[in-house]
């Protein structure tokens, strides 16, 4: 067996290499969201991290041997990404994980679920409390798992289908999602809050999907953002606003109480077509802005709500 000094050196070198690879791997996946391209990586994360760790340790031990020694000693190495395989990887493989298919399906379904609540006359003001409760629960779980590796492994096995690899050892993007919606549903009218949610649910998904597939064919407009992704957000934003204001608001007018719907064709200088086009522009702009490197799940509903409220308010006769 290797002596304690050699073991510590090998362990330190391996963990350093694995973390360095994990960061590069996460950054390359993040950059591919809209540009459709990423840094080529040889092998799986675990294989590449093993190679880096072995090289960093001077080849004095292999990953398998190091793990055996650490297990014998009872050491728990907290490795980012490389030691935890997400459910989407286990069930569908790396392609589905890379393109975040389960996450996008869930992301989009929230918009349809919210629309169903709207037509069933669920008071939008009652949505805030469940959102706040959900935020507190997810935050507590994240704090626990980020300080308890064993629980983190179990957590990722259960919810990993909806997680990004970079979230394995960082706070969950759901926190930002909930925080953005809490802001929108707390300070804006019913229609503005709902539209901001639709733009987050559908436009962000469209931008990510189209950007990954065709972003390399169009110019980049900012870091990790492509023209293809922004155009997709614009088109879906136009459709979302047109369908909501053009069909659902008048068809289900009985679920709207006085003052809840801010835009009215009789009191606004904006027609439905103009409002929808501006809604698409808001979606594209909110999705494309990189605000202090904050999470899109927070900036999109917040900026969308602010922009839509401002547009509708200034267009009143």
Swiss-Prot record:
Region of interest (Disordered), residue spans: 1-44
UniProt GO cellular component terms: endoplasmic reticulum membrane; nuclear membrane
Residues in the Cytoplasmic compartment per record: 152-167, 212-230, 293
Species in which this protein is naturally found: Eremothecium gossypii (strain ATCC 10895 / CBS 109.51 / FGSC 9923 / NRRL Y-1056) (Yeast)
A Pfam cross-reference name: CTP_transf_1
Membrane-related topology note: Multi-pass membrane protein
Lumenal topological domain residue ranges: 1-130, 189-190, 252-271, 315-317
Keyword Endoplasmic reticulum: yes
InterPro entries cross-referenced by the UniProt entry: Dgk1-like (IPR037997)
Gene behind this protein: DGK1
Record's keyword terms, sorted: Calcium, Endoplasmic reticulum, ER-Golgi transport, Kinase, Magnesium, Membrane, Nucleus, Transferase, Transmembrane, Transmembrane helix, Transport
Residue ranges crossing the lipid bilayer per the database entry: 131-151, 168-188, 191-211, 231-251, 272-292, 294-314
Entry's EC annotation: 2.7.1.174
Family: Belongs to the DGK1 family.
GO biological process, alphabetically ordered: phosphatidic acid biosynthetic process; vesicle-mediated transport
Required co-factors: Ca(2+); Mg(2+)
GO molecular function, one term: lipid kinase activity
Compartments where found: Endoplasmic reticulum membrane; Nucleus membrane
Broad class of the protein's primary localization: endoplasmic reticulum
Protein name in the entry: CTP-dependent diacylglycerol kinase 1
């Amino acid at each position: 067996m290797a002596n304690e000094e050699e073991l510590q050196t090998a362990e330190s070198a391996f963990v350093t290499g694995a973390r360095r690879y994990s960061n590069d791997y996460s950054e390359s996946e993040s950059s591919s969201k809209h540009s459709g391209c990423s840094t080529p990586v040889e092998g799986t994360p675990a294989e590449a991290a093993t190679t880096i760790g072995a090289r960093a340790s001077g080849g004095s031990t292999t990953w398998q041997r190091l793990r055996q020694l650490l297990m014998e000693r009872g050491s728990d190495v907290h490795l980012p990404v490389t030691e935890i395989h997400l459910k989407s990887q286990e069930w569908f493989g790396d392609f589905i994980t890379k393109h975040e298919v389960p996450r996008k399906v869930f992301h989009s379904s929230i918009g349809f679920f919210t629309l169903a609540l709207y037509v069933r006359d669920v008071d939008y003001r009652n949505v805030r409390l469940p959102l706040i409760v959900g935020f507190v629960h997810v935050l507590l779980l994240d704090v626990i798992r980020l300080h308890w590796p064993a629980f983190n492994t179990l957590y990722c096995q259960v919810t990993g289908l909806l997680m990004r690899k970079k979230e394995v050892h960082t706070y969950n993007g759901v926190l930002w999602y909930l925080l953005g919606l809490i802001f929108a549903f707390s300070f804006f009218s019913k229609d503005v809050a709902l539209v901001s949610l639709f733009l987050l649910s559908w436009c962000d998904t469209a931008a990510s999907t189209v950007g990954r597939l065709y972003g390399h064919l169009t110019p980049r407009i900012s870091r990790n953002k492509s023209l293809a992704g922004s155009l997709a957000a614009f088109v879906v934003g136009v459709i979302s606003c047109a369908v909501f204001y053009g069909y659902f608001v008048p068809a289900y007018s009985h679920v709207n109480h006085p003052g809840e719907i801010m835009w009215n064709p009789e009191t606004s200088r904006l027609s439905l077509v103009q409002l929808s086009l501006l809604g698409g522009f808001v979606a594209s702009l909110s999705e494309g802005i990189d605000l202090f490197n904050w999470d899109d799940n927070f900036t999109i509903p917040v900026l969308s709500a602010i922009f839509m409220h401002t547009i509708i308010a200034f267009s009143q006769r």
